[in-house]
């Protein structure tokens, strides 16, 4: 959630999700997975770590580190994604092939949020000529409430040819259409169980 007034103290968060499948920007990255995360935020700035580890040996393992800033509806961030899988094992120290560095820009208009992401270093994706494609992805999402449940409809696409998303895209391609439902179930005054699908 974004607000015009930034908080005056450091806030910390920690959590983990257990998911039945991991699909990211239209790509199937694994089955049942545990996805822990932690973050710090202060006056609009944030630093977070997030990961995903699947229960199957063939599932993608991932660690993301993100530095971001939000003001009003505007957001900007830089993320270091590290991916490895049984098909393409990679060492964490392999910054050229195992890491993808991405810049993100977004604006939340209230009823609709628009985000743009571009890979700028590491594994940036290549085009049909084998040249760096600086693979990009953009999404438009719209949150709404219905029947006591919070919903988010989202559509995402890659704007030009690259092999980073969905194996290969030879141009503009819609790669994700989703409808997410979420609800928090209050267990105690200080603990809630978030459910989403």
What are these regions (language model features)?
Residues 1-11:
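Cleavable N-terminal export/targeting peptides
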Residues 26-29, 57-58, 90-93, 126-130, ...:
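Short, solvent-exposed loop/turn segments at secondary-structure boundaries
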Residues 44, 109-193:
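Outer-membrane beta-barrel transmembrane domain signature
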Residues 14-22, 44-55, 74-88, 111-122, ...:
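Transmembrane beta-strand segments that form the barrel wall of outer-membrane beta-barrel proteins
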Residues 23-34, 53:
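Surface-exposed strand-loop-strand hairpins of Gram-negative outer-membrane beta-barrel proteins
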Residues 10, 30-34, 41, 59-63, ...:
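Residues that define the transmembrane beta-barrel architecture of outer-membrane proteins
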Residues 61-69, 74-99:
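Glycine/small-residue-rich loop that forms an oxyanion/phosphate-binding "nest" at active or ligand-binding sites
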Residues 16-18, 36-42, 65-69, 78, ...:
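Residues on the lipid-exposed face of transmembrane beta-strands in outer-membrane beta-barrel proteins
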């Amino acid at each position: 959630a974004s607000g015009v007034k930034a908080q005056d103290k450091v806030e910390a968060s920690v959590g983990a999700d257990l998911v039945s499948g991991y699909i990211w920007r239209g790509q199937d990255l694994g089955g049942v997975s545990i996805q822990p995360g932690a973050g710090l935020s202060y006056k609009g700035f944030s630093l977070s770590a997030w990961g995903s580890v699947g229960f199957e040996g063939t599932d993608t393992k991932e660690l993301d580190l993100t530095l971001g800033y939000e003001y009003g509806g505007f957001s900007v961030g830089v993320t270091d994604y590290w991916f490895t899988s049984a098909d393409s094992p990679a060492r964490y120290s392999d910054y050229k092939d195992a890491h993808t560095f991405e810049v993100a820009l977004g604006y939340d208009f209230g009823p609709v949020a628009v985000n743009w992401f571009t890979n700028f270093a590491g594994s940036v994706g290549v085009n049909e000529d084998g040249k760096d494609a600086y693979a990009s992805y953009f999404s438009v999402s719209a949150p709404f409430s219905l029947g006591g449940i919070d919903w988010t409809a989202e559509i995402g696409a890659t704007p030009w040819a690259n092999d980073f998303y969905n194996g290969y895209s030879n141009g503009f391609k819609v790669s994700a259409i989703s409808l997410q439902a979420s609800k928090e179930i209050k267990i105690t005054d200080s603990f809630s169980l978030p459910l989403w699908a």
